Amino acid sequence: MANNNSAKKRIEIAERNRLRNRTYKSSMRTLMKRCFSACDAYGSAPGEEAKASVQASLREAFSKIDKAVKVGVLHRNNGANQKSRLSSAVRKVLEPTS
């Protein structure tokens, strides 16, 4: 356990940041899973409503990833990799190769 006040304060700050980061990461993962499941649903039953659902879930996930990078929860390269994964999954479903 920390002995001086500054070390105690750093422990409190680290715990506060850990909890905040955990909520960002959790909601980001949830939105990514939602996007992947929307892609699967569109792949099994294509339609305009399913396509709109895929695009909306992609926008929400991108927004959450960008916010996580902005506040320092994720490194910008990690955020770019996550967005790339989502984009390629959506592109694969919406633009099938002929």
UniProtKB/Swiss-Prot annotation:
Gene3D superfamilies: Ribosomal protein S20 (1.20.58.110)
The entry's keywords: Ribonucleoprotein, Ribosomal protein, RNA-binding, rRNA-binding
GO terms (BP aspect): translation
InterPro entries the UniProt entry points to: Ribosomal_bS20, Ribosomal_bS20_sf
GO cellular component: cytosol; small ribosomal subunit
Keyword Membrane attributed: no
Protein transport found in the keyword field: no
GO MF annotation, one: small ribosomal subunit rRNA binding
Signal peptide coordinates: none
Family note: Belongs to the bacterial ribosomal protein bS20 family.
Function: Binds directly to 16S ribosomal RNA.
HAMAP family for this protein: Ribosomal_bS20
Protein name: Small ribosomal subunit protein bS20
Gene source species: Synechococcus sp. (strain CC9902)
Gene name for this UniProt entry: rpsT
